[in-house]
């Protein structure tokens, strides 16, 4: 029997601080990246709302033919501070694997947000104040790649118009200017180094884009399109189009790397070609070896339906029938009385070790790649004696009615996930994300790269919420071969 409980707040939020180190032609660079929900006590409804807004964006009709798009108030889980222009000025942008451009709010913009609940200052980029700013015209190669419209003619600016699922819009022009990265010059020492990139300059935002609860200045996309930051760096010979992440939801810490990973070795599965997102083919699913029947459309190889890997989504979403079968098989192996919290989260009381009591869920992908999701991955503690399932009934379908699975940060944690756009594959391996990985630079030299708690003694209790400051190293490698 299912009963309803009053909404409860999650008692523990982990504040994650990322440090991004990039090695380009002449050295390494550093960014500080912060979790969107850092230091804030969030209701379950806020986590679900984050994903709901993101899903609307992912399934929306988009006027701009890019391999993805951006939404400043809900798109990603992490944001970073970058510098644009000359002299360089600071802007806070969200880091997202589901977006394909870097864009920031630009002056003048009467409807852009002027404040945010994230505790960061918001700024408008102004091309008039940068000595290195250049307009991007319709005749520019960058524009000809993304714009296939007769209205974009000679001597006209390369503009964009994005429409989101909730009716929000973003309009603006593309600009070419310097992004300033902090070059690592020694142990804990950096010096600025600028590199020219093309990014969107948003001047007219409407709808939810003006909301202030979690607004930032823009988006930095790590998607597959040639317009993404990683693709622009690769086109200039600075990096290979390979990146990976390893996020630890148990002990804290983790790694985000751009470049080749030598160890641990990961098995891979093909990325479905010509898709906006990181689509892969799910072939089977089981609970401790007990198979679950999959909807036929999930095995499609043409990109209709299937499974999307998206680290910017918080939870994991399944078609209704598949969700019901999964929860039924899990609770058959460990009987619990489910209660619905905030109408969508299946929760239960439990005082024993969940990893010993609950089964492992295995997802099997093309080319025999397995994703094992352990109880500590798919269950989260609402309070000391209450757990909730991170699996959600998504009801997500394509416009053609094909079922969609969306695997978010919850099931990708505690794994090294590698996105190899050079070979159009994605893969993963179970890994202790608080330890290290071995990465390879363009010369073939291998280096140990690990996550460490730079502020290990910074845990504190704020309004009953335990806030743990963590650090994550992120490395991007020079891809030249000798």
From Swiss-Prot:
GO terms for cellular component: cytoplasm; cytosol; plasma membrane; pollen tube; side of membrane. It is an enzyme of class 3 (hydrolase). Changing residue 96 to N: Impaired proteolytic activity. It is found in: Cell membrane; Cytoplasm, Cytosol. Residues 1-27 form the signal peptide. Its EC number is 3.4.23.-. GO terms for molecular function: aspartic-type endopeptidase activity. It is a lipid-anchor; GPI-anchor. Its main location: membrane. Highly expressed in pollen and pollen tubes. Mostly expressed in roots, flowers and inflorescence, and at lower levels in stems, seedlings and siliques. A lipid is attached at residue 456 (GPI-anchor amidated serine). The keyword Ribosomal protein does not apply. Keywords: Aspartyl protease, Cell membrane, Cytoplasm, Disulfide bond, Glycoprotein, GPI-anchor, Hydrolase, Lipoprotein, Membrane, Protease, Signal. One of its GO terms (biological process) is pollen germination. InterPro entries: Aspartic_peptidase_A1, Pepsin-like_plant, PEPTIDASE_A1, Peptidase_aspartic_dom_sf, TAXi_C, TAXi_N. The keyword Kinase does not apply. It comes from the Eukaryota. Residues 78-429 form the Peptidase A1 domain. It holds the Pfam family TAXi_C. Residues 457-482 form a propeptide. Disulfide bonds join 347-388. Disruption phenotype: Reduced pollen activity and germination rate leading to a decreased male transmission efficiency. The double mutant a36 a39 produces inviable pollen which undergoes apoptosis-like programmed cell death, exhibits a compromised pollen tubes micropylar guidance and has degenerated female gametes. The double mutant a36 a39 accumulates abnormally highly methylesterified homogalacturonans and xyloglucans in the apical pollen tube wall. Glycans are attached at residues 32, 178, 204, 226, 432, 463. The active site is at residues 96, 310. Belongs to the peptidase A1 family. This is Aspartic proteinase 36. It comes from Arabidopsis thaliana (Mouse-ear cress).
């Amino acid at each position: 029997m299912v009963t309803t409980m009053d909404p409860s707040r999650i008692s523990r939020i982990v504040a994650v601080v990322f440090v991004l180190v990039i090695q380009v032609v002449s050295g390494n660079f550093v960014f500080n990246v912060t979790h969107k929900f850092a230091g804030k006590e969030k209701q379950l409804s806020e986590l679900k709302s984050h994903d709901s807004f993101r899903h609307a964006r992912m399934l929306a009709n988009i006027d701009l033919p890019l391999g993805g798009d951006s939404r400043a108030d809900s798109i990603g889980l992490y944001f970073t501070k970058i510098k644009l222009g000359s002299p360089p000025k600071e802007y806070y942008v969200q880091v997202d694997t589901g977006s394909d451009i870097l864009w920031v709010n630009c002056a003048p913009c009467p409807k852009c947000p002027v404040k945010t609940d994230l505790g960061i200052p918001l700024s408008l980029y102004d091309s008039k104040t940068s000595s290195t700013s250049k307009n991007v015209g319709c005749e520019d190669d960058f524009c000809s790649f993304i714009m296939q419209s007769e209205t974009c003619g000679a001597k006209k600016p390369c503009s964009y118009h994005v429409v989101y699922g909730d009716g929000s819009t973003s309009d603006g022009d593309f600009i070419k200017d310097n992004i300033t990265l902090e070059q690592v010059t020694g142990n804990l020492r950096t010096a600025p180094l600028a590199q020219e990139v093309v990014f969107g300059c948003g001047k007219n935002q409407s709808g939810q884009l003006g909301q202030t609860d979690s607004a930032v200045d823009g988006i930095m996309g790590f998607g597959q399109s040639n317009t993404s930051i990683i693709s622009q760096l690769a086109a200039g010979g600075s990096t290979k189009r390979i990146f990976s992440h390893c996020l630890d939801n148990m002990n804290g810490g983790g790694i985000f790397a751009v470049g080749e990973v030598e160890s641990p070795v990961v098995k891979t599965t093909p990325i479905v070609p010509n898709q906006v997102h990181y689509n892969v083919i799910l072939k089977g699913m089981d609970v401790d070896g007990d198979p679950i029947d999959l909807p036929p459309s999930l095995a499609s190889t043409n990109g209709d339906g299937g499974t999307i890997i998206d680290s910017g989504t918080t939870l994991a979403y399944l078609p209704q029938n598949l969700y019901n079968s999964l929860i039924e098989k899990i609770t058959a192996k460990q009987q619990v009385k489910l209660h619905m919290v905030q109408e969508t989260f299946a929760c239960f009381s439990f005082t024993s070790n969940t990893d010993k009591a609950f089964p492992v869920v295995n997802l099997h992908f093309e080319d025999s790649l397995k994703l094992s999701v352990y109880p500590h991955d798919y269950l989260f503690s609402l309070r000391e004696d209450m757990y909730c399932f991170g699996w959600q009934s998504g009801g997500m379908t394509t416009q053609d009615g094909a079922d969609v699975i969306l695997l978010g940060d919850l099931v990708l944690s505690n794994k090294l996930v590698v996105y190899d756009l050079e070979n159009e594959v994605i893969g993963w391996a179970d890994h202790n994300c608080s330890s290290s990985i071995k990465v390879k630079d363009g010369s073939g030299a291998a280096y140990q790269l690990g996550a460490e708690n730079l502020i290990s003694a910074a845990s504190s209790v704020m309004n009953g919420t335990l806030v743990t400051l963590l650090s994550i190293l992120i490395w991007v490698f020079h891809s030249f071969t000798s």
